[in-house]
């Protein structure tokens, strides 16, 4: 499987608010996890162009990440700018 518990812990440790492996609820850690999943699905769709169910799942993930980014932008702009810079996302 592409997303093992070790990979998730590493993502949460490097991107969460508390910088711990158990910080799974902060918007930063969820955005980082969604970004990892989006990158994986994008690579899958480059090979399998007609996989429309995966394409639908990818669009839903992008929407979830966008909503979390909008939430961070409205509540704490400094955390929003930090996660955008850290993950190299464009707005």
From Swiss-Prot:
SUPFAM superfamilies: S15/NS1 RNA-binding domain. The keyword Ribonucleoprotein applies. Disulfide bonds: none annotated. GO terms for cellular component: cytosolic small ribosomal subunit. Keywords: Ribonucleoprotein, Ribosomal protein, RNA-binding, rRNA-binding. SMART domains: Ribosomal_S15 (SM01387). Pfam families: Ribosomal_S15 (PF00312). PROSITE patterns: RIBOSOMAL_S15. Part of the 30S ribosomal subunit. Forms a bridge to the 50S subunit in the 70S ribosome, contacting the 23S rRNA. HAMAP family: Ribosomal_uS15_B (MF_01343_B). This is Small ribosomal subunit protein uS15. It comes from Cytophaga hutchinsonii (strain ATCC 33406 / DSM 1761 / CIP 103989 / NBRC 15051 / NCIMB 9469 / D465). The lineage of its organism: Bacteria, Pseudomonadati, Bacteroidota, Cytophagia, Cytophagales. The gene is rpsO.
């Amino acid at each position: 499987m592409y997303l093992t518990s070790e990979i998730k812990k590493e993502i949460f440790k490097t991107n969460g608010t508390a910088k711990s492996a158990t910080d799974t609820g902060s918007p930063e850690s969820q955005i980082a996890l969604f970004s990892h999943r989006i990158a994986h699905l994008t690579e899958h769709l480059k090979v399998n162009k007609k996989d429309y169910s995966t394409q639908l799942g990818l669009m839903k993930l992008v929407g979830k990440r966008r909503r979390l980014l909008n939430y961070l932008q409205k509540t704490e702009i400094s955390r929003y700018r930090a996660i955008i810079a850290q993950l190299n996302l464009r707005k």
